[in-house]
Amino acid sequence: MLKIGIVGGTGYTGVELLRILSQHPEVNIEAITSRKEAGMDVAQLFPSLRGRIELKFSDPAEANLEKCDVVFFATPNGIAMKQVPSLLDAGVRIIDLAADFRIKDIAVWEKWYGMPHACPELVAEAVYGLPEINRDRIKTARLIANPGCYPTAVQLGFLPLVESGAADLDHLVADAKSGVSGAGRNAEIHTLFAEAADNFKAYGVSGHRHLPEIRQGLSQAAKHPVGLTFVPHLTPMIRGIHATLYVKLLKEVDLQALYENRYVNEPFVDVLPAGSHPETRSVRGSNLCRIAVHRPQGGDTAVILSVTDNLVKGAAGQAVQNMNLMFGLPETLAITHLPLFP
């Protein structure tokens, strides 16, 4: 049994990790940390886990994380990078669900995240945890940078066309919408029910932290720098991401065949029949990314629709998928939950 530690177990990604890992047959959760809730039963804070998780939250200073096989960081940006070096030295493998190790250019990371990086020497080693492009590297990694929620949906939607050479790489457009859980569990005015319900708005139009992450991944896939306009939106739903992606085609291509062939062996990417319109509720609670491709009026613009659950494939589910790969377990183990409906 793998010994698991979770740093930051009280947010939405933390409780989603607990939900998934509590049903995983090959793991034992050793520690769940929270300074604020130290000493409290996990099931008291999260009644949904009653009968599944019998642990108490522990203070990070008292948790014996060095005895774990793998530690998940479900913490705000800037926390993991301060603790990861000592854990790696102790032989612990790391999966960071925050952004500390995603962006390879340290200056770019520091610009977007507004703080100096505490361990820049480890960034080059970190493997970007998108299995659909880095599966082999993930298997041997010590340190995984779990992708962001928007970057997962957007990159999986763009990848086949970007890799094919059939796309105008200078003018990619990603119009993405997220549920309010993507903003985290802290109390903020814009996510209050009275503010978010019956409302819809764009944000971060001049620049969002996920922009350099998406651009980095697509540029690596294309082996060429890409130009990307990324506009996120906040929608009045709890969980889910819907990305509408626009690509100008440079040559004739069978879009349906291209996407089906690219993802035929991917257990968590579902390419829908031609003309489909995926809905966020079709992936709610699952580790799936569902994609549909369109070519309006047979013109030179492809429209790709990509939907995920931001807390599962966009966070905790993908983290467990990476853990399975790292430890030689079946990739789909404990993350084949069917979507919730209605």
Swiss-Prot record:
It is found in: Cytoplasm. Pathway: Amino-acid biosynthesis; L-arginine biosynthesis; N(2)-acetyl-L-ornithine from L-glutamate: step 3/4. Keywords: Amino-acid biosynthesis, Arginine biosynthesis, Cytoplasm, NADP, Oxidoreductase. Pfam families: Semialdhyde_dh, Semialdhyde_dhC_1. It catalyses: N-acetyl-L-glutamate 5-semialdehyde + phosphate + NADP(+) = N-acetyl-L-glutamyl 5-phosphate + NADPH + H(+). GO terms for molecular function: N-acetyl-gamma-glutamyl-phosphate reductase activity; NAD binding; NADP+ binding. Its EC number is 1.2.1.38. It comes from the Bacteria. PROSITE patterns: ARGC. GO terms for cellular component: cytoplasm. The active site is at C149. InterPro entries: AGPR_AS, AGPR_type-1, NAD(P)-bd_dom_sf, NAGSA_dehydrogenase, Semialdehyde_DH_NAD-bd. The keyword Magnesium does not apply. HAMAP family: ArgC_type1 (MF_00150). Catalyzes the NADPH-dependent reduction of N-acetyl-5-glutamyl phosphate to yield N-acetyl-L-glutamate 5-semialdehyde. Belongs to the NAGSA dehydrogenase family. Type 1 subfamily. This is N-acetyl-gamma-glutamyl-phosphate reductase. It comes from Nitrosospira multiformis (strain ATCC 25196 / NCIMB 11849 / C 71).
